[in-house]
């Protein structure tokens, strides 16, 4: 299974929807709360090319984007193959 990382906040509805979508696929994302950790928020922005909105999702270290991008991947049939790949490293 893929390694999925998600930067989120506790009160973000899009974060909750992204987490629910991933869980429906059998994936428990490694979630980092950036509303309580400013160092992690800065790291998220660096990894996400300056994007500051949440969620920011990474699969096997590759930046996917936010919930809209995750949902679009799923609707196009491209999310499941990504999630089936073995985590690298």
Predicted features, each with a name:
Residues 1-30:
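Local sequence-structure signature of Cys/Sec-based thiol-disulfide redox active-site neighborhoods
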Residues 30-32, 62:
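Structural signal for short hydrophobic segments within the conserved structured cores
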Residues 34-52, 78-85:
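Thioredoxin-like thiol-disulfide oxidoreductase module
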Residues 1-3, 84-89:
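Compositionally biased, disordered extreme N-termini, encompassing classical targeting presequences
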Residues 16, 39, 65:
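Residues that form or flank phosphate/diphosphate-binding pockets in enzymes
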Residues 49-58, 68:
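Structural micro-motif
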Residues 59-86:
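Non-catalytic, surface beta->alpha helical segment in thiol-disulfide oxidoreductase systems
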């Amino acid at each position: 299974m893929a390694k999925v990382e998600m930067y989120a906040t506790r009160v973000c509805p899009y974060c909750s929807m992204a987490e629910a979508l991933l869980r429906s696929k059998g994936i428990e994302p490694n979630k980092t709360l950036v509303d309580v950790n400013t160092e992690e928020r800065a790291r998220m922005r660096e990894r996400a090319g300056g994007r500051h909105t949440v969620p920011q999702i990474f699969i096997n270290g590759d930046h996917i984007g936010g919930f809209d991008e995750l949902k679009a991947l799923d609707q196009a049939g491209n999310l499941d193959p990504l999630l089936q790949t073995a985590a690298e490293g």
